[in-house]
Design a protein with these regions (language model features):
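Short, contiguous pre-domain boundary segments
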Residues: 1-3, 67-68
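Short coil/turn linker and secondary-structure boundary residues
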Residues: 2, 39, 72-75, 98, ...
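Active-site rim elements
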Residues: 3-8, 76-81, 125, 129
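Short, contiguous alpha-helical
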Residues: 8-23, 27-70, 110-165
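Helix-adjacent hinge/juxtasegments
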Residues: 57-100
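Acidic catalytic patch
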Residues: 97-112
Length: 165
């Protein structure tokens, strides 16, 4: 079994769940924040929608430069979903095409010339999935605070039973 074959089932499950969360994001709450120091809901949703693209970058490139990363805007939910679907398809394709040796290649997160960290691609892919799941969890709290039903994720929520049960 290849590394990609071990990653893809988890990736598929997490992306399916993430899409269900993004579907619930109300477009009219883009500027809403639970606290002045928090991201706005629109910023957080756009971050979550874009993060699968970071996996594509990690598998196909050797660095990501945050200084070149576009800023955040407030997108309609439909646009976020289109972006998310495009990023998921690209990441899945990159993962499926990868060789085990690709995961040992060093990858760096940079801001201009400053290197924030460098790690093997395999660690970066896993950390990116974990990072996305973390922000997805934040987004579910935002949804709850604006009275939007929270979908089932790893089990039932107060709003939705677990699918298939």
């Amino acid at each position: 079994m290849t590394i990609a074959e071990t990653l893809l089932p988890e990736f598929d499950l997490e992306m399916t769940t993430t899409r269900r969360v993004l579907e619930r994001v109300p477009t009219d709450k883009g500027k809403w924040k639970p606290h002045p120091k928090s991201f706005s809901m629109g910023h957080l949703a756009q971050l979550v929608a874009g993060m699968p693209g970071w996996i594509t970058n990690a598998v196909q490139e050797t660095y990501l430069d945050l200084a070149r990363y576009p800023g955040y805007s407030y997108e309609k939910t439909e646009d976020l979903l289109e972006s998310f679907d495009r990023n998921v398809a690209g990441a899945r394709k990159a993962l499926a095409a990868s060789k085990d040796s690709d995961y040992a290649v060093q990858w760096s997160l940079k801001h201009g010339e400053r290197v924030i960290f460098s790690q093997p691609r395999g660690a970066v892919v896993r950390q990116t999935i974990n990072h996305l799941v973390h922000h997805r969890g934040q987004l579910t709290v935002y949804l709850r605070l604006v009275d939007v039903p929270v979908p089932s994720i790893y089990g039932p929520t107060a709003d939705e039973p677990m699918p298939g049960f």
